[in-house]
Structures are given as C-alpha cells and as structure tokens.
From Swiss-Prot:
One of its GO terms (biological process) is proteolysis. Keywords: Aspartyl protease, Hydrolase, Protease, Secreted. Signal peptide: none annotated. GO terms for cellular component: extracellular region. Belongs to the peptidase A1 family. This is Pregnancy-associated glycoprotein 56D. It is found in: Secreted, Extracellular space. Coiled coil: none annotated. It comes from the Eukaryota. Expressed in placenta, specifically the maternal caruncula tissue (MCT) (at protein level). One of its GO terms (molecular function) is aspartic-type endopeptidase activity.
C-alpha cells in the first residue's frame, strides 16, 4: 500500500 506512494518518492 504505502510502497506505491513511496515508489515515486524513491527517485
């Protein structure tokens, strides 16, 4: 769940 929003933040 949170991995999805964190995915774009993991640039």
């Amino acid at each position: 769940s949170l991995r999805k929003m964190h995915a774009l933040g993991e640039t």
